[in-house]
């Protein structure tokens, strides 16, 4: 497997994780996530010990949706966790976890920084996704872009400073609010994937100097 193929595969994982945070799972998306190809993907991903528990929860939830009511319940989870903005939710914005302010504002420093990254790469948040640029879905989508268009050092820096720096705090908040556990599993898988990717991107220590 060439490095290009590896980077493409990494990008696909980031795109998948991004899509799960970007919007609720609708009927079409459910078909994609439970297709034969998707089942093979989940199976392969679950072989990694650090991913197994999260992947199993994601798969069991998706495969267990057999009617519109169950799909609507998952959509309600997404709305309640990410769209309402109350103490019983877990807003997926970096600024809420990285800012030193008691009441951090949206569209703050992290949003401005992320907007600049997008601008430098000639990218922008799509109009159908009216969210601040420091939304986790945007950051993961940008990381997917970096996988195929940037040096390892750039990817490593972005992961460490812009995603890994707050993801654990987000998960801590999310697990307190997520009664059904699907999105907690997605977030936990995201963190495990990010940690593994960081380890792979870090330069190997020299044996001699």
From Swiss-Prot:
GO CC annotations, alphabetized: cytoplasm
Gene3D superfamilies (UniProt xref): 1.20.120.1820, HscB, C-terminal domain (1.20.1280.20)
Record's keyword annotation contains Cytoplasm: yes
Short name of one Pfam family: Nitrate_red_del
One GO BP annotation of this record: protein complex oligomerization
Keywords: Chaperone, Cytoplasm
Main location: cytoplasm
Subcellular location: Cytoplasm
Family that this chain belongs to: Belongs to the TorD/DmsD family. TorD subfamily.
Function as written in the Swiss-Prot or TrEMBL entry: Involved in the biogenesis of TorA. Acts on TorA before the insertion of the molybdenum cofactor and, as a result, probably favors a conformation of the apoenzyme that is competent for acquiring the cofactor.
Protein name: Chaperone protein TorD
Species name: Shewanella baltica (strain OS195)
Encoding gene per record: torD
